[in-house]
Structures are given as structure tokens and as C-alpha cells.
Amino acid sequence: MAIINPDIRITAAARFDTEAAVGNKILKQTLQQQSGTDARRLSRLSLIAALGAGLLRGQGEIRPDCAVFLGTPFSSPSVFEKMADNVLNHHAAMPFDFIANLHNAPVFHAAKTLGTHGATLAVATERHLETRFHPLLLAAQSLPNGGQAAVGWAYEHQATHADTREGSIWILLEHGAEHGVPVTLGGQTQKAERPSRQEAAHSETQGYYWQDVADWVEELGRRDNSAAAGTWTLDTRKAEHEKDRITVKKSAI
């Protein structure tokens, strides 16, 4: 298996948790207090992504050209549900709501909260084995010399996963950094398999859609670890020095 060492380190991490019972008004007020962002027109998914990004901003120096990659299984479900109800039950066309949710809105608002004007990309992904780490893989493969990239995973409540909490997880990648957890890329001989139904059901009971990603972030620097991303693996090593360990900044509403 070929191993590529791109001289990239994870230097910061953050996690924001909430749940469907928490109203949008509270999330908007929290974001306003945290970053001064005018959140009046933000979707719930954008609020969740931006609140997590704001925590990451407090963990390290974010440069103006920092890129932002965000993985999410869908655009804002609540906006789409409202739009579908208006169209199907009230026969009211909602073209602007439809168009407004087919773009990078959540990652754009996360970048605004981070204070960066770098490249942004929303990656359609699920918690299944072959897609969940695609945002990190894309960021690692596209990071220029001396560059930065904030990589996040956001989730807004969906009826199909009734017991899962909402939230967003973020890490900061830096090329050429002196401290942090190194990331290496390894090629696999075959594509990783999807988890079994039993494994998926177990993940459902863990209470968080991105639970496996959250566990991986918690273990950064604590032990050797490997994350599968399609035909690649993203490998991290146990930190040999205290300065290289990652502490995840957390907040919950």
C-alpha cells in the first residue's frame, strides 16, 4: 500500500451540539453573541455549521485565505419540508426557496463566521464508511504549500433518524505546521464496504449522526488511528509530545 506524507497536521478541533427541540431563535441569538453575525435569514443547517465554525475560530489563527470544506447529508431539511408543504398542500410555487437550497449556503456562512474568503465546498456525504471522510480527503489532497483548510461535518435533524442529535464537528488542517497531529494518506487495494444493518442500527443508538467522526476526532493524538475514505485511508499517529495533542473545544445548547 502506497503511503503519501503531505506534511499536513490537524492543529485544532471543535464540536457544537444541539437538538431539534431547541428553537431557531435561540440558535440565532447564540450566533449573534458569538460572532456578531446577522443570522435573520440563515437556515437551521447554516446556523448549526456556523456555530461550530465559530468555536474552531477560537482555537487557532484562521488566515483570510483558509479554505472551508463541509460535509452534510442534505441541505436544510426544514426548509425543504416547508417548501414541499407549500407546493403540494397549498399549491404555492416556491422557486426561490428551492434554488436557495441548492448551493453552498451552509459552508458559505461557516466561512463568514471564520472570517475567511478562501475556497468553499459543500460535500454531499453520509455517515456510511465510503463517504463520511470524503470532506477531509478532498481538503488534504487540495491543500497548497503553507495553506489552511477548515473541515467540518454538519447535521440537521431528519425524521428518518428521529433519535439523533444535531450539531457540527470541525478540524483545522495546516500544511507545514510545526505542531499538531500529522495526517498521512494511504491507498487501499479495494473499496471499503458499507456497514451492515446491525452496525448502522448500533450507530443510530449512539445518539449522534456523525458519531464515528466525533469518536475519531476525540482520539486524535491519543493513539494511532485510520479512517477509510473510499479507496484511501487517512492515518493519524499518537502524539509523542504534549504540544502535538488536540483538545476538542465543545459547546452545547
Where are these regions (language model features)?
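Conserved "HGTGT" condensation-loop signature of ketosynthase/thiolase-family condensing enzymes
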Residues: M1-D97, N101-F133, Q141-G147, G152-I253
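Aromatic- and glycine-enriched pocket-lining scaffold segments that form the walls
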Residues: L138
